[in-house]
From Swiss-Prot:
Keywords: Cell wall biogenesis/degradation, Germination, Hydrolase, Signal, Sporulation. Residues 110-125 have a biased composition (Low complexity). Belongs to the SleB family. One of its GO terms (cellular component) is intracellular immature spore. This is Spore cortex-lytic enzyme. InterPro entries: Cell_wall_hydrolase_SleB, Peptidoglycan-bd-like, PGBD-like_sf, PGBDSf, SleB_dom1, Spore_cortex_SleB. GO terms for biological process: cell wall organization; spore germination; sporulation resulting in formation of a cellular spore. Residues 109-142 are annotated as: Disordered. One of its GO terms (molecular function) is hydrolase activity. It comes from Bacillus cereus (strain ATCC 14579 / DSM 31 / CCUG 7414 / JCM 2152 / NBRC 15305 / NCIMB 9373 / NCTC 2599 / NRRL B-3711). The keyword Cell wall biogenesis/degradation applies.
Amino acid sequence: MRQKAIFKIAVLLAFIGLSLMVSSIQLKNVEAFSNQVIQRGASGEDVIELQSRLKYNGFYTGKVDGVFGWGTYWALRNFQEKFGLPVDGLAGAKTKQMLVKATKYDKSTANKGTTTNKGNSGGTAQENKPPQNKGTNVPNGYSQNDIQLMANAVYGESRGEPYLGQVAVAAVILNRVTSASFPNTVSGVIFEPRAFTAVADGQIYLTPNETAKKAVLDAINGWDPTGNALYYFNPDTATSKWIWTRPQIKKIGKHIFCK
């Protein structure tokens, strides 16, 4: 009886030891990145890690400079597509886990040849590494408040539309921000008098879903399915005669997009 008890304890201890070993390995893999979702506009150590792993796997051909630009964005999307992940250009938990799983590499080797110091082609990656920064993770030119406000607007204006139509609404907001005919801030565009129905009827204050947020990020990252439209309207509900005078570009879902 005593021997059985000792045997059970030994098995239990072995199981605990194995669990701790697995947890340690998983923790080591996770620690390759911080916990933040890495997206275009981010910079620092997380981006160096991301670029190095994408480069090792043959998806990224640019410099490992710690700046998440368009080259890194499209390389990441191609990696996600290849490995059956959601293709959104965001390095979240699942994407980072797959990167770690798919990569066995020496980061210092991956970084060789990517230095930019003139007259020092033999410099090491460590010598030319940008300052450590794991906190910058907002698309260029836009704050988290901008992204949240746009998600509210997209959800309030187009939550019943296909995904392409939601990206299109976000793109119109961005097109107005860069147009001389409109305010040059996200909040200025959205809260301009009589600009958006969702503001007038209060739907702007509904809590947006993840689809609306993703549509905003896709638009910020350069996807404009409207062809640079500045206006849109629903022909079934529009009461303005003026909107019908605008040159029409295309129809997406229930909305007609115009110049």
